[in-house]
A protein has these predicted regions:
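C-terminal nucleotide
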Residues: 165-262
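ATP-binding N-lobe of GHMP and related small-molecule kinases
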Residues: 1-96
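Alpha/beta catalytic cores of group-transfer enzymes, especially the acyltransferase/condensing modules
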Residues: 124-168
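A generic local secondary-structure boundary/capping motif
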Residues: 2-3, 31-34, 98, 135-137, ...
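Short, hydrophobic/aliphatic alpha-helical segments
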Residues: 82-94, 129-134, 239-249
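DPxDG-like acidic metal-binding loop motif
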Residues: 100-124
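Short beta-strand segments
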Residues: 7-9, 36, 148-149, 180-184, ...
């Protein structure tokens, strides 16, 4: 049996601009800003040679359909041109569906682990591009993998997959702590398919990215994230109440993750 392991951080998007017009899927993505966090997903893959491909995915030990992960496995096995029974075990340390980049982390860590296990010899960016493609096709993310591949507090200046899109980093102290809590899910696929939400994002997202580039700080990122969340209208009363309480206690410009009740 062949085994390999890889890690990918979680990621919180504060605001973004949809950039999915290009025909080339590697040029599709988003401009935006957010932060990668230490907690994420550790993925272990196990492979046994077989007469035909079979894929099993476990999330924290529980069998799951996991279409994004299975899509990554399909891409990687096609490159290997061999058949295997593949078991993928995601050790997930972040909430799923809460806007903390679980789908991107699962996709990227799976691709990294399979690149090792299958001895494909792909570069880091080429591996990340596979995860990016799968996210775009499944409508589970636009720029998350680009951000996760770089880490830190980022501005996604140019859309596209890793190696094509461009990320610049906002300098922060090494002891900076991100405080977040999650109370529910918002399905990214539904949000990206909602024309009304898309129109609101397109109206404001790009302007906020340009504003942050001019004045790049984590304080400005949080301020613009809050403005974005308020203007696209996704904050429910529970989120608004929590943010007010946080601000009363010194957490200035607390905001909402895109997309999740986080």
């Amino acid at each position: 049996m062949i085994t390999a392991k890889a890690y990918c951080p979680g990621h919180i998007t504060g605001f973004f601009e949809i950039c999915d017009q290009p025909k080339d899927i590697l040029k599709k993505g988003s401009r935006g800003a957010g932060v990668s966090i230490e907690r994420g997903i550790i993925t272990t893959v196990s492979l046994r040679p077989a007469s035909q491909n079979l894929v099993k995915v476990l999330i924290n030990g529980i069998k799951s359909e996991a279409p994004v992960t299975k899509s990554v496995v399909k891409h990687m096995l096609k490159l290997a041109n061999k058949n295997f029974i593949v078991t993928v075990n995601h050790d997930v340390k972040i909430p799923i569906g809460a806007g903390i980049g679980a789908s991107g982390a699962g996709a990227f860590s799976t691709a990294l682990a399979l690149n090792k296990a299958l001895n494909l010899g792909l570069t880091y960016d080429k591996v990340a591009q596979i995860a990016h493609i799968v996210e775009i096709v499944n409508k589970t993310g636009l720029g998350t993998v680009l951000a996760q591949s770089r880490g830190g507090v980022e501005i996604r200046v140019k859309p596209g997959a890793p190696g094509i899109g461009h990320v610049d980093l906002i300098p922060v102290d090494s002891d900076t702590v991100i405080v977040c809590g999650s109370n529910g899910q918002i399905e990214t696929k539904k949000m990206l398919s909602n024309l009304e939400i898309r129109e609101k994002i397109e109206r404001i997202g790009g302007k906020l990215v340009d504003e942050l580039i001019i004045n790049a700080s984590i304080e400005k990122l949080m301020e613009l994230s809050k403005r974005f969340a308020m203007e696209i209208g996704l904050m429910n009363e529970r989120i608004k109440k929590v943010i007010k309480e946080l601000e009363k206690n010194g957490f200035v410009n607390a905001s909402m993750a895109m997309f999740g009740e986080t």
